[in-house]
Regions:
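Short, conserved micro-motifs composed of acidic
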Residues: 234-240
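Structured loop/turn residues at secondary-structure junctions
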Residues: 43-44, 195, 211-212
Length: 240
């Protein structure tokens, strides 16, 4: 069955339908933000997604910068903290001034533009069969919510990567990589040991680095501008 789906590029309906359940983050949860959503996906769909991931991940890893630490083998939050600490120490040794901004994208994983994502996958050389499968998966995807009184009707989604799918991590990393590259292209302001370093990333968390506050503000403005072209909105309250 997996081989047939792969050859024709069409996913069965039960593979593309996701059931969402809500778990309380705290006992007295009254708002939507007080709950955590969990996606229930068909087991066979997960198997096919894992096969698909193995076929495309090498080309994606090859284009990701060394500044991305999220969802990568052998890398984690400790590496991010260590890198930021080294940058801070080296900067203090050679310069008195530096500017840093911690960027937070609003619901980043839910805002990925599918058309833009497909263009990027084609650009890095992902085979048309894999692109077709990914595109058809998203185009056919529907979501229903499971509540105490039953389940809601299924509704189509129009953007975003799938929660709980192993493809989502690498697809988002790739999407984020192209967004930041386009926004900060040509920037040569901040160097450590002769190497240009202006971002540190962990999945959707982004740190911008600059020597001067004015340059940093220009980077933020450009990131907001290009981010909107990618369907992203900066969370002003959490960006600092």
């Amino acid at each position: 069955m997996i081989n047939t789906i792969y050859e024709i590029g069409e996913w069965p309906k039960d593979f593309t339908e996701v059931t969402m359940i809500f778990l309380k983050k705290k006992p007295q949860a009254t708002k939507c933000s007080d709950h955590r959503t969990i996606s229930l996906i068909a087991r066979t769909a997960k198997i096919l997604a894992k096969i698909l991931r193995r076929r495309i991940e090498k080309k994606i890893w090859d284009v990701l910068g060394e500044d991305q630490f999220g969802f990568r083998r052998g890398k984690g939050t400790r590496d991010v903290i260590g890198m930021l600490r080294i940058i801070s120490e080296r900067t203090l040794e050679i310069d008195k001034e530096r500017s840093v901004c911690f960027i937070d994208w609003q619901k980043a994983f839910d805002r990925v533009n599918w058309s833009k994502l497909m263009q990027i996958l084609k650009k890095i050389g992902i085979d048309w069969r894999e692109r077709r499968l990914i595109s058809n998966l998203y185009m056919a995807q529907s979501v229903k919510v499971r509540l105490n009184r039953g389940e809601t009707r299924s509704v189509k989604t129009e953007r975003g990567v799938r929660q709980g799918c192993c493809l989502s991590q690498i697809l988002f990393n790739l999407y984020s990589e192209y967004l930041t590259k386009e926004a900060l292209e040509g920037l040569r302001d901040f160097k450590i040991g002769g190497q240009i370093i202006h971002t540190v990333k962990y999945a959707d968390d982004l740190v911008l680095l600059a020597k001067e506050e004015k340059v940093l503000q220009d980077m933020i403005d450009k990131l907001i501008e290009i981010g909107r072209c990618y369907g992203m909105e900066m969370n002003v309250e959490k960006t600092n």
